[in-house]
Design a protein with these regions (language model features):
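Short acidic, Gly/Ser-rich segments with clustered Asp/Glu that frequently serve as metal-coordination loops
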Residues: 4-8
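Helical "lid/coupling" subdomains associated with nucleotide-phosphate turnover
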Residues: 10-25, 29-45, 51, 55-186
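Short glycine-aspartate micro-motif
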Residues: 1
Length: 186
C-alpha cells in the first residue's frame, strides 16, 4: 500500500496475513524532493507537477519542457522523472527489504499487488518488477456500489473499501450459536 505518509507491506499465505510492516516514509517525500531539486518553494506546486507529469521510469519519459505553475521557469520532464524515480527506487527497495525479512520473499508465487495513491504513478509496476524480480499487478475492489462509483475505483480508497467489505460480510453472518450449539441437539 503506497500511501502518502507511509508504505504498508503485507505478505499473505493461504489467505491469511503472514507478515505486516509499515515503513514511516511515503510518496509525499517525492513532493519535497521536487520542491528542493527545482527550488520551487511550494510543496503543493511540487505535488501537482508530480501528479501531472511524474513517472516511475525516466527511460519511458519523452523529454519536454514543463512550466512551473505561477512562475516564468521551466524544467525538463526528464529531470523531474529522474528525481521521482530516484525516490521511488529508495521507497520500493525498503518495501522489498521488508518482504525479504518476512522469510517468504522467494515464495511470492502470486507476485506483488499494489494499492494506495502511489500505485497510480505511471510505470510503477514495471519499476517494482525490475527491482524485485517478481510479477507486479494492481489490487482491485469488486462490487462497489456508491453515488460516485468512479471515484471509489481509485486505489487511494482500496484499503478502506476492503475493510468495509469485510465488515459487511461479518454483519451478514448469522449470530446464533454456530455449529457447536447444534452439536448436542437430538
Amino acid at each position: 500500500d503506497l500511501g502518502a505518509d507511509s508504505i504498508k507491506v503485507q505478505v499473505f499465505q493461504d489467505g491469511l496475513v503472514y507478515f505486516d510492516e509499515e515503513l514511516p516514509l511515503g510518496c509525499s517525500t517525492i513532493d519535497g524532493d521536487i520542491n528542493t531539486a527545482f527550488s520551487i518553494n511550494d510543496v503543493e506546486k511540487a505535488r501537482k507537477l508530480k501528479e501531472e507529469f511524474g513517472m516511475a521510469l525516466r527511460a519511458s519519459c519523452k523529454n519536454r519542457k514543463i512550466m512551473i505553475p505561477d512562475t516564468k521557469y521551466c524544467i525538463d520532464s526528464h529531470d523531474l522523472v529522474h528525481v521521482e524515480q530516484s525516490r521511488l527506487e529508495e521507497l520500493l527497495e525498503g518495501a522489498i527489504f521488508q518482504m525479504q525479512e518476512s522469510g517468504c520473499y522467494e515464495d511470492l508465487d502470486d507476485g506483488i499487488l499494489l494499492t494506495g495513491g502511489g500505485s497510480q504513478v505511471v510505470g510503477i509496476e514495471v519499476l517494482l518488477s525490475k527491482l524485485s524480480g517478481h510479477s507486479v499487478g494492481f489490487a482491485k475492489v469488486a462490487s462497489v456500489k456508491a453515488d460516485r462509483e468512479a471515484s471509489l475505483k481509485s486505489p487511494v480508497y482500496f484499503t478502506a473499501l476492503g475493510l468495509l467489505q469485510c465488515e459487511r460480510r461479518e454483519v451478514k453472518k448469522p449470530k446464533s450459536g454456530g455449529w457447536f450449539s447444534n452439536f448436542f441437539k437430538e
